[in-house]
Amino acid sequence: MSWGTELWDQFDNLEKHTQWGIDFLDKYAKFVKERLEIEQNYAKQLRNLVKKYCPKRSAKDEEPRFTSCLSFYNILNELNDYAGQREVVAEEMGHRVYAEIMRYSNDIKGERKSHLQEGRKAQQYLDMCLKQMDNSKRKFERECREAEKAQQTYERLDNDSNATKSDVEKAKQQLHLRTHMADESKNEYAAQLQNYNAEQHKHFYIVIPQVYKHLQEMDERRTVKLSECYKGFADAERKVIPIISKCLEGMVQAAKSVDERRDSQIVVDCFKSGFEPNGDYPFEDYSQHIYRTVSDGTISTPKQESLKPDPRVTVGKAKGKLWLFGKKPKGPALEDFSHLPPEQRRKRLQQRIDELSRELQKEMDQKDALNKMKDVYEKNPQMGDPSSLHPKIAETTSNIERLRMEIHKNEAWLSEVEGKVSQRSERRHSAEANHLVAQGRESPEGSYTEDANQEGRVQPQPHAHPEFDDEFDDDEPLPAIGHCKSLYPFDGNNEGTLAMKEGEVLYIIEEDKGDGWTRARKQNGEEGYVPTSYIDITLEKNSKGAVTYI
């Protein structure tokens, strides 16, 4: 199958077909360009998406690292790698497909133009030969007619008796001339005809088949190039499939790494305050003196002091802790983290001690290295001056002392926190035990069994007017055990808290029990809890000695 033999007379159609082939090549190149632009935009959008949702945390950020968050961040990293592979696909399409098609399209356009020009030249040469043959043919025809006319004239004059001899001779010469010219035209026509036939045979069997063969080869190469580009287009995707599969596998592994129990423990570690829950409210039996009057026949002074609940563990204190489940009052961050709950304070102090210990180890290693270098300099003075290291050694020694003092100070704070938490737990268990013992001593009739030990421990306080005790017990204010001065303003929005201004002087009626809150009273008698870290406390000597907390 050859275009030169099968399509010898289809030059115009072949010209249109080859032009269509080049247009189709350009169309596919445009498709590839738009396809790689889609890949580039897709990769860019993926990277922007990853950048948008990646965590923006500083090196000192202590955000809890939940496994679900870590898994999501790992998925974002894998997605970023996936976006990189989409960029590789776009780059591969651009280099191996689009650039190759554009280069080949320019080459094939020039080649097609050359082959078509060659075919047109061959056709023009054949047309010229045909025209020359036609001219010689018409000339031969014309000369033959002239010779025929000359012969008719000669025969007419030769048969005419009136014609002169000179006229006959002249007609005869004209006849010979026309006959000779006709013979020459005949020979020329024969030569032109033979030449045209030869050129026509050469044109249709040699020149045109060669031109069409080149066009056919060009078109077939174009088809092969398209096939290669189709394959390269698919190979660009196939080459990144293993890496993309690894990215997807990484996402699956990240999903499997989610641990709900660990996340729950992180929540506990992050928000555990170390506070103890409020104890049970004691039963306040106001009917004891009634039953004792009926049974004994006398009216005795009830042991109201022993029955009166401790105001420091009742409503006031419960209200003071409501911030644990509401909006925690904010204050300035202190060096000893006393503004934090006990458990969080303990964790932060331990973290700081660990950091300081690492810094101390670095400084000690540096000091050892400097001492070794100093020894080397002393043994080999040509290597350096030992005295040049003295400032650095002194600075390192100073840093070591400073870090040791910091560690000692933070360890003291840590011991204080751990001691307070332990004491608070012991107080709570002791209070619960006493409450259970008191309940166990109550008789079914509502009276109390006399206990010499208990009577020795708990003595009723005499009152000048016992008949008014029940009426004013709840309103009797607690005695002040010291005073304090507020260092910072406090809004006191939560129930049970006391608002105060900076520099305001308050009375202390209950010390901090390790929860970071101190009970105080204003000059106008208003009571409530204030943050211990917000005030400068001075206790009276007759209570526990003059002690100042800052």
Swiss-Prot record:
Its main location: cytoplasm. Gene3D superfamilies: 6.10.140.470, Arfaptin homology (AH) domain/BAR domain (1.20.1270.60), SH3 Domains (2.30.30.40). PROSITE patterns: F_BAR, REM_1, SH3. It is a peripheral membrane protein. Residues 479-540 form the SH3 domain. GO terms for cellular component: cell cortex; cytoplasmic vesicle; cytoskeleton; plasma membrane. Residues 423-467 are annotated as: Disordered. Residues 423-432 have a biased composition (Basic and acidic residues). Keywords: Autophagy, Cell membrane, Coiled coil, Cytoplasm, Cytoplasmic vesicle, Cytoskeleton, Endocytosis, Lipid-binding, Membrane, SH3 domain. The keyword Coiled coil applies. InterPro entries: AH/BAR_dom_sf, F_BAR, FCH_dom, FNBP1L_F-BAR, FNBP1L_SH3, HR1_rho-bd, SH3-like_dom_sf, SH3_domain. PANTHER family: FCH AND DOUBLE SH3 DOMAINS PROTEIN, FORMIN-BINDING PROTEIN 1-LIKE. Required to coordinate membrane tubulation with reorganization of the actin cytoskeleton during endocytosis. Promotes cdc42-induced actin polymerization by activating the wasl-waspip complex, the predominant form of wasl/n-wasp in cells. Essential for autophagy of intracellular bacterial pathogens. The F-BAR domain binds the phospholipid membrane with its concave surface. The end-to-end polymerization of dimers of these domains provides a curved surface that fits best membranes with around 600 A diameter, and may drive tubulation. Homodimerizes, the dimers can polymerize end-to-end to form filamentous structures. Interacts with GTP-bound cdc42 and wasl/n-wasp. This is Formin-binding protein 1-like. The gene is fnbp1l.
